[in-house]
Structures are given as structure tokens and as C-alpha cells.
Amino acid sequence: MPKLPAVGIDLGTTYSCVGVFQHGKVEIIANDQGNRTTPSYVAFTESERLIGDAAKNQVAMNPNNTIFDAKRLIGRRFDDATVQSDMKHWPFEAFAENGKPRIRGTFDVSVLTIEDGFEVKATAGDTHLGREDFDNRLVNHLVQEFQRKHGKDLGQNKRALRRLRTACERAKRTLSSSTQASIEIDSLFEGVDFYTSVTRARFEELNGDLFRGT
């Protein structure tokens, strides 16, 4: 009797994906945009609900109604110090209902052995360690640099922060294959252009404890 294929779904903090195991190998399934990962974003407009790439692509124009990082709230109280820290990076509003979390979740990673059936060997993870954590460190670093250079605090401007975060995401990807990345944002805040660069060594220094925790 031929073996049936198995489907695995990764609902990640930042990105989600679906894979199928068949013919002895795993294949990651592309979404309707042709991408193998889908941003864990949902957005609400006056006429529709957007999910994934469509939601993330319009976040700069609709920051207050675009939700992401939802997994960071799982199992935590609203007054949790970690939640309060994360809220500084969210353009949308989060609020409490009796101070209690309304959703729960499980760990992120499971190790299985697959023969005739499957056996779970280990389960572990950290719902509060994802790509956004690395982005946040770089965003905070550049917010401080902008204030030091120009004497302006863009930390409370949601649109400026979103543009800066998008640039940081691109820089992070560049640093995976290059030793330095440039960040150039015209009229980032109050008409001030922001041009800077970050080295891979500096990025690793900013995120040293996160790398050690992976």
C-alpha cells in the first residue's frame, strides 16, 4: 500500500508556511503570490479584510488597522513587561479584557521519527523569539542614531517607524550574504532624510543574546 503524503503547517510569529512530505522529501507549497512563506499579517479596510502579502504590502498606508505579532500575546497578561515592551513597536492599538489572555498556544518545534507511523521525540520552542525580535533591535538602534544625528525623536510616529522597520528588514536580509547594508530613506521624519549603514558585525553585536538563544 503506498504511503500517504503528510502536510505540515508552520504558523510562525512573522511568517507562516505549508509543506508536504511525499516521495521521500519535503516540498514547501507556494502561496497565491508565488512565495513560499506568507507574512503572518491581517489588515482591515473599510471594504475588505486582507491576509498575508496583501496585508503587509499596505501596512505603511494603513498601520493602525494592520495586525501582526499576534503570537507574542499568547499566554501572556496585558500587564506583562514583555507585552508592554512589544507594544512600543506596534502601530496598532492593543488593549486588555480583564487583564487576561483570551487565546492560548503550544510550543513551536517538535522532533518526530517517522516509520510506519510517527513518534514525537521532543517538543520545545519560544513563542517570543522570531524575526521581529532581530528587527526590533536594529530599529531601536537606528531610532537612537536618528535622534543623535538630527535631534528628533521619531519613536512615536507610527508611519516613520513602519518605513524604518521595512528598511531594517531589507538590511537584515542583505546582511545574510554581505558584510554591510545601506539604509536610505527619503523624508523619514519631519522632512529629514536618513542615510546610514550597518555592518554584519554590528548587527550580530546588537542581537548577540538572541543568536545565543536560537
Swiss-Prot record:
Tell me which UniProt keywords the record has, alphabetically: ATP-binding, Nucleotide-binding, Stress response
Q: Which GO terms describe its molecular function?
A: ATP binding; ATP-dependent protein folding chaperone
- Which Pfam families does the record associate with it? HSP70
Q: What Gene3D superfamilies would the database entry show?
A: 3.30.30.30, 3.30.420.40, Actin, Chain A, domain 4
Q: Where are the transmembrane segments?
A: none
Please report which protein family the annotation says this sequence is part of: Belongs to the heat shock protein 70 family.
Q: State the protein's name.
A: Heat shock 70 kDa protein cognate 1
**Gene (name only):** Hsc70-1
